[in-house]
A protein has these predicted regions:
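Conserved D-loop-proximal element of ABC-family nucleotide-binding domains
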Residues: 134-135, 139
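C-terminal lobe/lid and adjacent interdomain/linker elements of RecA-like ASCE P-loop ATPase modules
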Residues: 143-191
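Walker B catalytic acidic pair
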Residues: 127-129
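Phosphate-coordinating catalytic segments in nucleotide- and nucleic-acid-processing enzymes
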Residues: 1-111, 175-191
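The start of beta-strands in P-loop NTPase/AAA+ ATPase cores
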Residues: 95, 122-123
Length: 191
């Protein structure tokens, strides 16, 4: 599978031997969120690129899907892990909370929203959208993805095997901006 831009530039070549080997092309903003990306080490770097920008507000807005009491998010050094990890503050609480203590779903939302916000004018690939996300919050995340992809001119490609995910996509797609494509393997042919 290859995605090309303007019929010439290969943005994402996928290779049979390593389906996770992706080469990013210079000049085209691109992010790939894999199925297992919940607490990716890249999140701190992605956060830094949009910190103090107009888009930063969308991070907490997206996290509100799962916990509306979140006020702020920042990445702080963790001496044990030797990396920066996400912490949040909650309304009415002074203590900071590690985002990792709040479940896989909220960490998946963070990874998705940070990747999306770093693709302005580019492309986001999101493998298995629903992984770690309860079906009840999927429609709200889809609405944020639709809104931001239109606002920031981002083309989003998502895979899923989940009927709940497909149903929430259809419900959130009220402006008909998204397109659902079903691929099947029939007798060795993709149709």
């Amino acid at each position: 599978l290859e995605i090309t831009f303007a019929g010439e530039t290969t943005i994402v070549p996928f290779y049979k031997r390593n389906r996770y080997a992706i080469t990013k092309m210079k000049g085209i903003p691109f992010e790939y969120v894999r199925t297992y990306d919940f607490q990716t080490t890249q999140n701190a770097s992605l956060f830094d690129k949009i910190s103090l920008s107009a888009e930063e507000k969308y991070i907490v807005e997206a996290l509100h899907i799962i916990d509306p009491d979140i006020e702020k998010l920042n990445f702080l050094n963790d001496d044990l892990q030797k990396r920066r990890i996400p912490y949040v503050t909650l309304k009415g609480k002074e203590k900071r909370h590690r985002l990792s203590s709040m479940g896989d779903g909220i960490n998946r939302v963070l990874t998705i929203i940070l990747a999306l916000l770093n693709c302005k004018g580019g492309i986001l690939l999101l493998d298995e959208f629903e992984t770690g996300l309860h079906h009840s919050i999927q429609i709200r995340l889809w609405k944020i993805i639709f809104m931001l992809s239109e606002k920031l001119n981002i083309q989003v490609f998502v895979t899923s095997h989940s009927q709940d995910c497909i149903n929430s996509f259809v419900e959130a797609n009220n402006k008909q901006k998204g397109k659902l494509i079903r691929l099947e393997n029939r007798n060795g042919n993709v149709v």
